[in-house]
Amino acid sequence: MESQQLHQNPHSLHGSAYASVTSKEVSSNQDPLAVSASNLPEFDRDSTKVNSQQETTPGTSAVPENHHHVSPQPASVPPPQNGQYQQHGMMTPNKAMASNWAHYQQPSMMTCSHYQTSPAYYQPDPHYPLPQYIPPLSTSSPDPIDSQDQHSEVPQAKTKVRNNVLPPHTLTSEENFYTWVKFYIRFLKNSNLGDIIPNDQGEIKRQMTYEEHAYIYNTFQAFAPFHLLPTWVKQILEINYADILTVLCKSVSKMQTNNQELKDWIALANLEYDGSTSADTFEITVSTIIQRLKENNINVSDRLACQLILKGLSGDFKYLRNQYRTKTNMKLSQLFAEIQLIYDENKIMNLNKPSQYKQHSEYKNVSRTSPNTTNTKVTTRNYHRTNSSKPRAAKAHNIATSSKFSRVNNDHINESTVSSQYLSDDNELSLRPATERI
């Protein structure tokens, strides 16, 4: 009878035997993993089912599933949301363990030994969509490291949660990366994260928390697909795929370089020279602008540079426009040499003009200086005084006496006229009346 029952229902016998054996082993060994499946969390139960269905061996395939025993298998890890980052080889497991970040995992799965991440940022469900545009948390961290750094120079997170932040647009091409970075930085500032973004010198006002780091990584990965990033950004992320702040810092520096290129072009197009400064200074200024553009892979030909310089010449240098108007092979060095020649000629002429004026003024001073005086600064207008020159009082006295004497002379003239008439009657002679010499 027993043999017939064994042939009729062999699976039930093996199942009961397996159950009895496992139950004895559990009771004897007191395996901590031998707990009831009903006591496991829901997500552990799901992960166990997935692993039990995928990983089956020939020895256990014929044995029915035992709900009283759970084998110690690792939990399944969900793949990252953005597959492009994984396909391009982000970070090896050894580097990930060394940097204390999980390998290819979502920010919610990143390991942090001293920090308990708040469940408000992520859910334990692996199918939970990331990122959720939740503002970075600013709660105080129970991390003892944070308590030690309370008096450090870089303060910790003290921001407030800011809701309803408009997310940035998605990057569409590699050429628009710098424009996208501007919007992404504005998005972080609107999320109260402006104080953890490095400035132009690479300095930050405070250290970011774990949640803020995860939030930045999460949003950057969501809105900037890996295959649309520039090559230098990919190189940084291949070394450390979570180092987003370095990418932002270098992006800002490169944007400033682009702004400098624009400023150099504007300065080169608006060149002006009239000889007020030295020709050497003008040449150094123009050469520096051209060299800076060349370092940024922008070559300025000699013909273009000469045309821009000639356009801004004025004064004595303006005639060079007509000289170079018909030239096809313009050399920048030759143009600088001719500008230097004109500048030197004008300088010599300006030096000679003051010397001639100085000699002329000295001649005038000598002609107006008295030869008897020792002080050359004391000049007299008429240093050759004639003997007939008299003071004003003497002149006034002479005028008064001359007027008085004129009346006497008039009387005498009248008398002499009468006498002359008498003589003319007698002798027919006319004599000149006698006058006194003054």
From Swiss-Prot:
The keyword RNA-binding applies. GO terms for biological process: viral translational frameshifting. Residues 1-88, 364-397, 419-438 are annotated as: Disordered. It comes from the Eukaryota. Residues 295-397 are annotated as: RNA-binding. InterPro entries: TYA. One of its GO terms (cellular component) is cytoplasm. Keywords: Cytoplasm, RNA-binding, Transposable element. GO terms for molecular function: RNA binding. Retrotransposons are mobile genetic entities that are able to replicate via an RNA intermediate and a reverse transcription step. In contrast to retroviruses, retrotransposons are non-infectious, lack an envelope and remain intracellular. Ty2 retrotransposons belong to the copia elements (pseudoviridae). This is Transposon Ty2-B Gag polyprotein. It comes from Saccharomyces cerevisiae (strain ATCC 204508 / S288c).
